[in-house]
Amino acid sequence: VISAGLTALALSATACGGGSKGVTVQGAKLVQKGALTTCTHLPYPPFQSEQGGKVVGFDVDVIDLVAKKLGVTQKIIDTPFETIKTGSALNAGKCDVAAAGMTIKPDRAKFIDFSQPYFNATQALMAKKGLGVTSLDDVKAKKLKLGSQASTTGEDYVHGKGLDSTSFKDSGSELNGLRSGQADVIVADYPVVQGWLKDPANAKFELAASLNTGEQYGFAVRKGNNPKLIQLINQVIDESKKDGAYKAIYEKWIGPMPAGG
């Protein structure tokens, strides 16, 4: 397991930050000596979730490679997604890097510096079996209750298509909303839906449709403040794709890697 022994979870979003003196390692600025501090938003499997007291997932394993390159240990801070995409968590010195299955968007790039894309993503609809849903048009025509995660590109996408949705604070709440009947259909990132459907507890649900939104995920650092860290992250992404580490992480958390991926 790539992340074994490398990742520690800080249960409070205020566990590190402005109070500690920053250090520089290989030109990269770090808020805490001996650690690469990562802001994320839990739970968001398969990219990050807590299992057995540890945070694990796709993003965790990739950032562990960055921490290893720096000779430090990754430390994870759970913080609201809103504070990640607006850059406020990074600006407050709570973390060095944001890794949260976050889509690269121009409006977000005004506040944070993105790495190169590390994951090609899209959206999906998950619904109870038998509803006959194959598109957003079906959701609208059948007047079904649609659920989405707050402040996400999935929510933005369905709203842009003229649909209203019940907004849930995180992906776990969104899934529970579907299970409890608060929503008939939910929109979420495709790999997240794939992960949910592997759980026998979700056997009565199905992948109703994929929505090709052309999204790509990126990691992020404080705007205009840490170019060496972004450079190092990009280097690790490139190297991991060449040496097979990225493929191993992909197959571990997502499944078979697409050709050319």
Where are these regions (language model features)?
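C-terminal motif of bacterial Sec signal peptides marking the signal peptidase cleavage site
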Residues: S12-A15
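Bacterial signal peptide processing site
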Residues: G17-G19
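Extended ligand-binding regions for polar small-molecule ligands
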Residues: V60-K69, T152, G218-M257
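Bilobed "Venus flytrap"/periplasmic-binding protein-like clamshell domains
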Residues: L42-P45, V55-K69, A121-S173, Y190-Q194, ...
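Acidic, polar ligand-binding/catalytic clefts
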Residues: K75-D138
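Extracytoplasmic small-molecule ligand-binding "clamshell" domains
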Residues: G22-A100
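Periplasmic-binding protein-like
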Residues: L42, F119-A127, Y190, Q194, ...
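Short helix-initiation/N-cap motifs at beta->coil->alpha
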Residues: I76-S88, G132-T134, A150-T152, T166-S180, ...
